[in-house]
Amino acid sequence: MHYPEPLSKLIDSFMKLPGIGPKTAARLAFHVLAMKEDTVLEFAKALVDVKRHIHYCTICGHITDTDPCYICKDERRDRTTICVVQDPKDVIAMERMKEYNGLYHVLHGAISPMEGIGPEDIKIAELLTRLQDETVQEVILATDPNIEGEATAMYISRLLKPTGIKVTRIAHGLPVGGDLEYADEVTLSKALEGRREL
């Protein structure tokens, strides 16, 4: 189908988003076309603002508009425990259950030799540096329960063994092959409670 150039560019832009194919992108573009101009401008401003003002916390790697993030700044949090997750969305999922009160470390990925992602490509070195500076007694590995997440957890566990820091893995109330961000609060809570030492 041939669309006018501005509409075609919008469709192409929507297709850059994960899970958006040509039909959905066209449907979204036509929806934008039907919206009031002030609503479209507000939407465009929100996109620009997110890109300009949201960045990663220099301590934990979570998304934030301040540095450090609100979690790292919160003195009431348990600074003896760090929960290691793959993605900022996992922090949001863990926070939703309102049971974990420690700190986080976001790896921004998982070890995946098939995709050419090694330990040096994710934030493992930053975790090791952080563990030297803080009084951490336990590291909870909450990577996804899939091959990449397990490989990452085992790799970090082996690295931390000589440090004397207790290393635990969240229990698998989570489905194998699933993503942490999609788990409900009860499942996440039970997985955290049932964590095991590695």
Curated annotation (Swiss-Prot):
Identify the PROSITE patterns for this entry: RECR, TOPRIM
Among SMART domains, the record links this protein to: TOPRIM
Lineage summary = Bacteria, Bacillati, Bacillota, Bacilli, Bacillales
UniProt keywords (A-Z) are:
DNA damage, DNA recombination, DNA repair, Metal-binding, Zinc, Zinc-finger
Question: HAMAP family recorded for this chain?
Answer: RecR
Please describe what this protein does.
May play a role in DNA repair. It seems to be involved in an RecBC-independent recombinational process of DNA repair. It may act with RecF and RecO.
Q: Which gene encodes it?
A: recR
The Toprim domain extends over 80-175
Q: Which Gene3D superfamilies match?
A: 3.30.60.80, 3.40.1360.10, 6.10.250.240, RecR Domain 1
ZnF (C4-type) ranges: 57-72
**Name of the featured protein:** Recombination protein RecR
Which GO terms of type biological process are on file? DNA recombination; DNA repair
> Has UniProt tagged this entry with the keyword Hydrolase?
no
